[in-house]
């Protein structure tokens, strides 16, 4: 049976970079599950790579069709932004392993949908001061920086990824992203061990 490797972490902890590097490795034969969002596309993003970008009408249509596995809504200073996972044919756990990024709330919903055995959580940590600087640097590169939203998201993460919630979700293994090379090495070793052990047990 295949697994879904689920990357989590606070904003600007380096999840996107870790995701791209793990996919670049190619040694674990991980496939992507591209989530959907109604937020505006950022500079440097491409539709269908980090996310499928849609609007509220598109979300409601998929919801009515019963294709939304999990969804989250954030009341931002620019209106409601939704992030969601869709049962659109991307996921086949009979033989394939997948890699995706999400929130703790989404992880719990994915676990409820697919089962605990199908999901491998990978929680990425980084000092708050470093995260805040990274978030600011990213906004400065945008054509129209959204500083208010950056601050809202930074503060919301403290509640969304509180120690109590992490413990309740059963998140134990954590990976410090101060040094990207070491972080990637640790995650790769962790996943190779678990995916290999899982495959061997299924044979």
Stretch-by-stretch model annotation:
Residues 7:
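Hydrophobic anchor at the beta1->P-loop junction of P-loop NTPases
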Residues 13:
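ATP-binding Walker
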Residues 99-103, 117-135:
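Conserved phosphate-donor/acceptor-positioning beta-strand/loop module used by diverse small-molecule
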Residues 140-190:
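Small-molecule kinase domains that catalyze NTP-dependent phosphoryl transfer to phosphate-bearing small molecules
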Residues 196-202:
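Conserved small/polar residues in nucleotide/adenosyl-binding loops
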